[in-house]
Amino acid sequence: AARERFADVGNVTIHLAGGEDPFADLMNQHATQLGMENTHYENATGLPSENHYSSARDLMRLARHIILDYPEHYAIYSQKHFTYNNIRQPNRNSLLWRDDSVDGLKTGHTEEAGYCLVASAKRGETRLIATVMGTSSSEARAQEVQKMLNYGFRYFETERLFRAGQELMASRVWGGQADEVSVGMPEDIYVTIPRGSREQLESVVDLDSVIKAPIKVGDELGRVRVVLDGETLVDEPVLAL
């Protein structure tokens, strides 16, 4: 349904939500949860409507959510063809044929929006998402996204800063059987940074001023921030290990 606009799928989702307006409300709620600050849905089709809009940054956020939270479904976006009811339809993302590192994600076109594309590619440990909106043709959108991807892979790299379960530090515990508790991250933390800039990263762990027992594994005890040239790249909770 994400690659080809099947009316049947739209009708099913609208039916499950109790109508198109309630379905749009659900989409707006989810968009808010994802931090999509410049997006508002009015329908399930994506067709133009007065108060139906999004931004390139918000579409990137949505793409990132799909890639990270639904890896079991993400492979569908790399399929070059889809057959339904004995009709074989090509994926309109032409970059799938041009660049082996591209594995998604979604094209779009209306007269008002122009030719749009949200694409993702992975080379080595680095995954990038590139978005264009309002281009003049399907070829133009492919070329512009390819330029952005090539630029990104040339000048940026992805580094793993923290491993899941890795001890960042130990902190004093008051009133417990143990004097200290180890703190760390619940999952791997990656950043994409300009090549050669890892040594310039600054990490700061801010723990609660007083940590009192009882403490169980997974309790949030503070936050870790990673800064590069004054910009905060990571701001995540640190937990008891």
Predicted regions and their residues:
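Domain-terminus/edge residues, biased toward the C-terminal soluble/receptor-binding domains
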Residues: 48-53, 57-241
